[in-house]
Design a protein with these regions (language model features):
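Conserved GNAT acetyl-CoA-binding A-motif
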Residues: 107-120
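A short beta-loop-alpha structural element at the N-terminal edge
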Residues: 4-19
Length: 153
């Protein structure tokens, strides 16, 4: 099992976190998306957009190994996971689960009753393993494919 450390994202680490998101998205999710979907994903998942959201209602945590960011999770309003990415070479080592568990604990601590996610097709089985339930069939909005899901806490 890999040893990793989870910490709240610091602004000086945002560019590295964005790189993890970009690399993982392009490898595993972009092949299922239209050109429009890829463009719209990057309208959301870019430095300026995420920095602005961090100043409002979004929080992010990163997993680091020897100081290198290998995983990222983001959530907003203490109730909606909007990013969860782990670099390919570090997947299947418990990093996504550890990031997820931290967010769930944070949500429980503020009395959140339900957490939602719009899961990509690639991550759908991961969220099912985490105990999420599909709210609907796969949907596509602005070229972005997702499964709306929720989990009662």
């Amino acid at each position: 099992m890999l040893e990793f450390k989870i910490e709240e994202l610091k602004l000086e680490d945002l560019k590295e976190a964005i790189k993890v998101i970009e690399d993982t998205f392009l490898k595993f999710e972009a092949p299922d998306y239209s050109k429009e979907g890829i463009e719209n994903f990057f309208k959301f998942a870019n430095y300026e957009s995420i920095r602005e959201k961090l100043n409002k209602n979004m929080k992010m945590y990163v997993a680091k190994i020897s100081g290198k960011i290998v995983g990222v999770i983001g959530y907003r309003d203490n109730s909606h996971i909007n990013l969860l990415f782990v670099l390919e070479e570090y997947q299947h080592n418990g990093i996504a689960k550890a990031l997820y568990n931290l967010v769930i604990e944070n949500c429980k601590n503020v009395a959140t009753k339900k957490v939602t996610v719009n899961s990509s097709p690639y991550a759908h089985n991961v969220y099912l393993k985490f105990g999420f339930i599909d709210d609907n069939q796969m949907q596509e909005v602005d070229g972005i494919k997702f499964y709306p899901m929720h989990k009662e806490l």
